[in-house]
Amino acid sequence: MPKKILKGTVVSDKMDKTVVVSVERVFQHPLYKKTIKTRKKYKAHDEENICQLGDMVEIIESSPISKTKRWKVLRIVKEGDTQ
């Protein structure tokens, strides 16, 4: 089975070699047909500490790296606004 790739925004980069990525998913409710947005946060491994707050990144599934990390940063899609 291929590994999942998700796209999201970095919401925290305060940990060493770890970033928190918020992934937004849009789907339609099966019964009421209302469009719903949900967000989920994933901790992702960032080996070189290159990701910054606000960056749009792609993350890929991996084997467990720690207790809560099961994703790795694949690439930075778009750099965020740094102030």
Curated annotation (Swiss-Prot):
Name of the encoding gene: rpsQ
PANTHER family in UniProt: 40S RIBOSOMAL PROTEIN S11 FAMILY MEMBER, SMALL RIBOSOMAL SUBUNIT PROTEIN US17M
Name of the protein this chain belongs to: Small ribosomal subunit protein uS17
InterPro entries according to UniProt: NA-bd_OB-fold, Ribosomal_uS17, Ribosomal_uS17_bact/chlr
A Gene Ontology BP annotation from the UniProt entry: translation
Family: Belongs to the universal ribosomal protein uS17 family.
Superkingdom per UniProt: Bacteria
Keywords: Ribonucleoprotein, Ribosomal protein, RNA-binding, rRNA-binding
CDD domains per the UniProt record, alphabetical: Ribosomal_uS17
Keyword Iron: no
Function noted in UniProt: One of the primary rRNA binding proteins, it binds specifically to the 5'-end of 16S ribosomal RNA.
Subunit and interaction comment: Part of the 30S ribosomal subunit.
GO cellular component: cytosolic small ribosomal subunit
Cross-referenced NCBIfam families: PRK05610.1, uS17_bact
Cystines in this chain: none
GO MF, one example: rRNA binding
Keyword presence, ATP-binding: no
